[in-house]
């Protein structure tokens, strides 16, 4: 959530910065709401003062033995007016809050301006795409050859955009997750978490999923009440971030580094995007997610660090990739700056996003009231939060299958995964 004080003091600047990400801030609506809020606040304060004065008059009159029936009637009317005014004020404040919750984060000045993929800035490439002297198969074909990817039965069990994995492919999928978790815990210093896959509305609002992405979530409806108290997590970022909701940390505790492997559930039924075949866009997929909660002065530095942690996954797997700085129109709702890591898929002859690494600044911290106290200045200040996929396991699996394929349809196992694959060298 954007700082409400910044909205009130410099609305035109906020509108200008949000326009860089193609978001039109309704300035007139906000000013009208703010003007009405101030009027209601003054009326409320005036009535409260009048009621207090009336109470004193009644007290004095009673002490003199005077008839106070008429004065009490006036006080009663004032009380009714005040109650009505407070309710009106509360409803207005709720509308203002909903308006503020609908605003995306302000892009950092370093973020390139634009709204198309061509406007993203390529920072670097790592590794060279392999050369093959045989017809390249995509991961769907390789999964069929090795009898490990079963889209047909997944459709029978549930519907489209789900997958059944079995045998050595399922083993490889598990090996990738174990390798990633071990890397981030043992080498990068994260603490591993096991999390609920269902979260409540407060958690979704806190992470910035609501109200913006309501239709992209799988909601769990309570049969008796008809309400949606829970939703399946779209990413482990949601529960991880909310672990510091309503928490005040000491500066010495920072940074907090958390990692989790969870399934993720996203409705996203559209066919938008560059790649939709196979494991690339699923309703259910697994992901290793890293989250850091940091001192506000260090978040841009930590963005480089957390991105490098995701990059090491791809480097150790020896998968060619490129690092992209997203333009203003492509960064996520809560992000102020985002790097995407795109892994090379030979069958597509293109790069495909496998990790998104974002600095969210104080956008989530303001929603969840996550703060810290400094060593010298003990006044509570908002923290900064960052998140990074470390990485999407299904897409990493697709990349391993395609980049390590052999002419006879077998797939070589990356050497770094050997300890997790019972030392087998190939998927047959």
Curated annotation (Swiss-Prot):
Subcellular location(s) of the protein: Cytoplasm
GO molecular function (one): ATP binding
Binding site for L-serine: 235-237, 289, 389
Gene (UniProt): serS
CDD domains reported in the protein's UniProt record: SerRS_core
Pathway(s) the chain acts in: Aminoacyl-tRNA biosynthesis; selenocysteinyl-tRNA(Sec) biosynthesis; L-seryl-tRNA(Sec) from L-serine and tRNA(Sec): step 1/1
Protein's recorded name: Serine--tRNA ligase
Enzyme Commission numbers on file: 6.1.1.11
Organism: Blochmanniella pennsylvanica (strain BPEN)
Free-text comment about domains: Consists of two distinct domains, a catalytic core and a N-terminal extension that is involved in tRNA binding.
Lineage: Bacteria, Pseudomonadati, Pseudomonadota, Gammaproteobacteria, Enterobacterales
Keywords: Aminoacyl-tRNA synthetase, ATP-binding, Cytoplasm, Ligase, Nucleotide-binding, Protein biosynthesis
């Amino acid at each position: 959530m954007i700082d409400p004080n910044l909205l009130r003091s410099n609305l035109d600047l906020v509108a200008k910065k949000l326009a860089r990400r193609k978001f039109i801030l309704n300035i007139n609506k906000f000013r009208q709401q703010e003007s009405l809020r101030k009027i209601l606040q003054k009326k409320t304060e005036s009535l409260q003062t009048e009621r207090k004065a009336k109470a004193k008059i009644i007290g004095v009159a009673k002490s003199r033995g005077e008839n106070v029936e008429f004065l009490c009637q006036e006080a009663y009317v004032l009380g009714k007016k005040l109650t009505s005014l407070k309710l009106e004020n509360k409803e207005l404040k709720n509308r203002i809050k909903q308006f503020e919750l609908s605003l995306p984060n302000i892009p950092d000045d370093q973020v390139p301006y634009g709204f198309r993929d061509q406007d993203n800035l390529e920072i670097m490439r790592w590794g060279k795409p392999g050369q093959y002297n045989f017809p390249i198969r995509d991961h769907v074909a390789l999964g069929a050859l090795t009898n490990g990817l079963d889209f047909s039965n997944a459709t029978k069990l549930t519907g489209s955009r789900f997958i059944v994995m079995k045998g050595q492919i399922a083993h490889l999928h598990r090996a990738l997750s174990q390798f990633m978790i071990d890397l981030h815990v043992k080498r990068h210093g994260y603490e591993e978490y096991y999390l609920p896959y269902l979260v409540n509305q407060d958690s979704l609002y806190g992470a910035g999923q609501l109200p913006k992405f309501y239709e992209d979530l799988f909601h769990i409806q309570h049969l008796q009440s008809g309400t949606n108290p829970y939703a399946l997590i779209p990413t482990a970022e949601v529960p991880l971030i909310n672990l510091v909701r309503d928490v005040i940390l000491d500066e010495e505790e920072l940074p907090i580094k958390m990692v989790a492997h969870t399934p993720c559930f996203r409705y996203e039924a559209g066919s938008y995007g560059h790649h939709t075949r196979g494991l690339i866009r699923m309703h259910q997929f697994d992901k290793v997610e890293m989250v850091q909660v940091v001192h506000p002065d260090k978040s841009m530095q930590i963005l480089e660090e957390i991105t490098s942690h995701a990059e090491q996954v791809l480097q150790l797997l020896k998968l060619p990739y490129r690092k992209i700085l997203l333009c203003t129109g492509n960064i996520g709702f809560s992000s102020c700056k985002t790097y995407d890591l795109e892994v090379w898929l030979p069958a597509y002859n293109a790069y495909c996003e496998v990790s998104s690494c974002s600095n969210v600044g104080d956008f989530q911290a303001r929603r969840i009231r996550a703060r810290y106290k400094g060593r010298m200045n003990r006044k509570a200040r908002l923290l900064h939060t960052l998140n990074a996929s470390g990485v999407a396991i299904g897409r990493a699996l697709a990349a391993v299958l395609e980049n390590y394929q052999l002419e006879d349809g077998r797939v070589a196992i990356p050497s770094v995964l050997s300890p997790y694959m019972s030392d087998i060298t190939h998927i047959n």
